[in-house]
Design a protein with these regions (language model features):
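Generic structural signal for hydrophobic
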Residues: 125-129, 152
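Polar/charged alpha-helical tracts
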Residues: 100-103, 124, 168
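Core AdoMet radical
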Residues: 110-120, 129-145, 156-172
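Short, charge-rich amphipathic alpha-helical segments embedded
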Residues: 38, 150-151
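Well-ordered, non-membrane alpha-helical segments in soluble/globular domains
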Residues: 84-89, 121-125, 146-147, 172
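Long terminal accessory regions outside catalytic cores
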Residues: 1-63
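N-terminal [4Fe-4S]-dependent radical SAM core
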Residues: 39-115
Length: 172
């Protein structure tokens, strides 16, 4: 399957997982984590899901309240979009593309890119980076208006963004 088909399938699975977890509770979440652990291909993925399995074994795990709060307060589409953009786009597909490039060039390439908001080159850099497999960004807006991130996110819907900003600068 090509990137877009696989991403679309992954998004469908993410929506199903969120819905099942909302309806069936954390047992469903553990089932999905177990399934992903079984399907994990490389060692980093296996390690990640082994850690997730271990964290979810304890019924008093702090992750349960965090997940419950997330499911209660965040729109399902946003949960799935961020999860797919970061998980599939950034850590699976993107990381694999970046590794191929790094092997060719003989030097590692980061899977997350940090930049300052207000940099005029960002609107050109994001699509170019995505073509090479880089979909995850950390943008610093501590000295600028964070509104640019909204425009960048709308223009690059397959990327995931983290934002450093003064909370008082954020509005709906």
């Amino acid at each position: 399957m090509d990137y877009n088909s696989t991403r679309s399938f992954t998004m469908t699975l993410a929506h199903r997982a969120v819905g099942d977890t909302r309806r069936g509770g954390f047992r469903q979440l553990r089932n999905y984590v177990d399934m992903c652990a079984t399907l994990a291909k490389n060692q980093q993925q296996k390690d990640f899901f082994a850690y997730a399995q271990k964290a979810l074994q304890r019924t008093d795990s702090c992750y349960y309240s965090l997940i419950h709060r997330l499911l209660d307060s965040v729109d399902e589409d946003r949960i799935c979009t961020v999860g797919v953009n970061m998980g599939f786009g950034g850590l699976i597909y993107g990381a694999s593309e970046l590794k191929k490039q790094a092997d060719l060039e003989g030097q590692p390439i980061a899977w997350i890119t940090a930049a300052r908001c207000g940099d005029e080159r960002l609107s050109e850099l994001l699509p170019k980076a995505a073509r090479h497999g880089s979909f995850v960004w950390l943008l610093d807006a501590t000295d600028t208006d964070p509104a640019q991130v909204v425009l960048l996110a709308k223009a690059n819907p397959q990327s995931a963004f983290g934002l450093l900003a003064d909370p008082s600068a954020l509005t709906e």
